[in-house]
A protein has these predicted regions:
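Active-site neighborhoods and metal-handling regions in enzymes and metal-associated proteins
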Residues: 1-595
Length: 595
């Protein structure tokens, strides 16, 4: 038996004792986070799949894992040798979890499915209960966490220190943010609100932590009432300075595990709960007269950056650009010298970023995919998959950093030597899509779905497409993936506004061959106002040359060439003062105009 088989055997022994026919393991934590602390990586532990999105379902005789297109190839590799069947979300013929359970349990008498109500959202569980009932006879149990019994040496909840995010970077005081939140609550006719999302809590309180790898958040809950603010957090995370700061801002402190009791005794008439962010367990604990089921107002506030945050991004992008130039100057000669691998170049890039002021961490695990690994959208090199780089072909490097004044996210695909005509064609198509999105002008309030088509159109014309989103929001020294605004094919109702930060990251992936992605972090800013309304534009924040060697210039429109040359001129002008002479010469060559 391999390790996954042993874990499944232990789980099934427990399921048998508990009279459960199946158990569902999500990728989330008690706060519905995308990236979670080690304590909550239960889906990874039970399946072996380490992607940030996916759901594992285990019955007494079978197991399956659902994930999205970013992870199809990675999941295929990681699930190999296990009994897990890979379910490719949104692909024709892929059953839903409920459909699969209906088939797997059709001959089971009085089947009961289990899940942990603490790590599943209220809306998810509510919909699941309804769907299982429609199948007939399948019930759902929500009060069991099997990992507490079968996961030996399970990591404990993190207890890392919390720090204050200075006002010079936050740009708005805690008191001002709470006042804005309370105003929104009054408009929603709510007396209070439970905040579960960790990045929303960090933003509202101007605090940061290190409880989650790459994400500067801390495990906690926040209760905002009309006359009181309560933070539920382990006391040992808070220094005397942080406690005094919270006291000065009239924030009461309670232990993290007291939130349930507080909700049970909540005295206001009603409370706002976001069903996508609040766990089923805590929702059911609320005993007040009325629950206002509505989306949290915080993400929309957090999405529009203030002047200090925007200046912080610009500063962070300068530092990150300097690190990237040093890295790219080093890369090709190092590969030609031999011995460099996907992992070793990742370590080099991180070390160069760490030399920059205000560097705190990387913002996600670097994706450095050489040759066919570049076609795995969210590839992460391991000692088992790591390969030596050769002075030929393409390498896709998607990386980012957390600086105290801003978060960065950048992808560059680099030609390490000779490239094929097919590589040039695909590379140039991706570049065209990237540029077209950055050229677009659009009405204030347009949706990300409308913009998505602008970037993809040149690919669609040739029958190409990519299945991930074109862009996601980016936090301000917070999570690198931030909502509610996105640019993607699926309908995104959130209106785009000036001050929002996003990524522009189209890509094309040829399985078994190579992948190309080009990504800038961008800012939505004012363009003009006319009798027809206010119009917005996209401004690149990322400062780093785009490799011009794999470009088929004949494929580019004049306006695309003009954009690239203007962008490269800006990159050189802004970065060169921070480089030595050799680096300046390299950057000048990397940013010289194309014709």
């Amino acid at each position: 038996m391999n390790e996954i088989e042993l874990r499944l055997a232990r789980l099934r022994e427990l399921m048998k004792r508990e009279h459960l026919s199946a158990f569902i393991f999500p990728s989330t934590d008690a706060h519905q986070s995308e990236y979670v602390a080690d304590h909550w990586r239960g889906r990874e532990w039970i399946s072996g799949f380490n992607g940030s999105a996916g759901t594992a379902v285990v019955t007494m005789k079978s197991a399956a894992l659902w994930t999205d297109s970013r992870y199809f190839l990675a999941a295929e590799e990681q699930l190999e040798g296990t009994e897990y069947q890979l379910m490719r979300l949104k692909m024709e013929g892929t059953p839903t979890i409920v459909e699969w359970l209906g088939k797997e349990l059709q001959n089971v008498q009085s089947p009961e499915v289990g899940l942990d109500g603490i790590v599943n959202s209220y809306n998810y569980v509510k919909d699941l209960i309804y769907s299982l009932r429609k199948l007939g006879g399948i019930t759902l149990r929500t009060n069991l966490d099997p990992l507490e019994q079968i996961w030996e040496n399970r990591p404990s909840l993190p207890a890392n220190p919390v720090e204050i995010q200075p006002l010079e970077y936050a740009g708005e005081t805690l008191a001002s943010k709470v006042a804005r939140i309370r105003k929104s609550l009054r408009e929603l006719h709510a007396d209070g609100m439970l905040v579960s999302a960790l990045d929303d809590i960090a933003w509202a309180l101007n605090l940061r932590g290190t409880d989650v790898h790459c994400n500067p958040v801390f495990v906690s809950y926040l209760l905002i009432e009309s006359d009181k603010v309560s933070l539920f957090v382990d006391d040992n995370k808070l220094s005397p300075e942080v406690k005094q700061y919270l006291q000065d801002n009239q924030v009461s402190l309670y232990n993290y595990n007291k939130v349930e009791k507080c909700l049970e005794s909540y005295s206001e008439y009603n409370i706002l709960l976001d069903g996508d962010e609040t766990s089923y367990y805590l929702w059911k604990a609320v005993k007040c007269q009325e629950i206002v089921a509505a989306g949290s107002p915080i993400p929309a506030m957090k999405a529009v950056k203030n002047k200090a945050e925007i200046e912080g991004y610009r500063s962070a992008m300068l530092k990150d650009g300097v690190a990237m130039v040093k890295f790219l100057k080093w890369l090709k000669p190092a590969v030609e010298a031999g011995g460099q691998t996907e992992i070793s170049i990742d370590e080099k890039l991180t070390s160069l970023r760490a030399e920059q002021k205000l560097f705190r961490d990387i913002s996600f695990d670097t994706i450095a995919g050489y040759a066919q690994h570049g076609a795995i959208v969210h590839y992460e090199a391991t000692p088992e998959t790591d390969v030596v780089l050769k002075p030929e072909g393409l390498i896709l490097i998607d990386s980012g950093a957390q600086y105290q004044d801003g978060t960065t996210d950048i992808t560059r695909t680099i030609a390490l030597g000779a490239v094929s005509e097919e590589m040039k064609h695909i590379y140039t198509l991706v570049l065209k899509a990237h540029i077209q999105l950055e050229l677009v002008k659009f009405p204030d309030g347009a949706s990300g779905t409308q913009l998505d088509a602008v970037g993809r159109e040149c690919m669609w014309r040739e029958g190409y497409n990519f299945l991930h989103g074109t862009g996601h929001g980016v936090g301000s020294y917070l999570c690198v993936h931030e909502g509610p605004h996105q640019i993607r094919m699926e309908w995104m109702p959130t209106p785009l506004r000036a001050g929002m930060t996003l990524t522009d990251e189209p890509g094309l992936y040829l399985a078994g061959k190579f992948g190309v992605r080009i990504e800038n972090t961008v800012l939505i800013s004012d363009y003009m106002s006319t009798e027809f309304g206010k119009f917005l534009q996209i401004e690149p924040l990322t400062l780093c040359p785009i490799d011009t060697t794999p470009i088929d210039v004949d494929m580019l429109l004049p306006e695309e060439i003009d954009w690239l040359n203007a962008y490269h001129h800006s990159v050189y002008e802004k970065l060169s003062p921070f480089l030595d002479e050799e680096e300046k010469i390299w950057l000048e060559n990397a940013t010289k105009p194309i014709k």
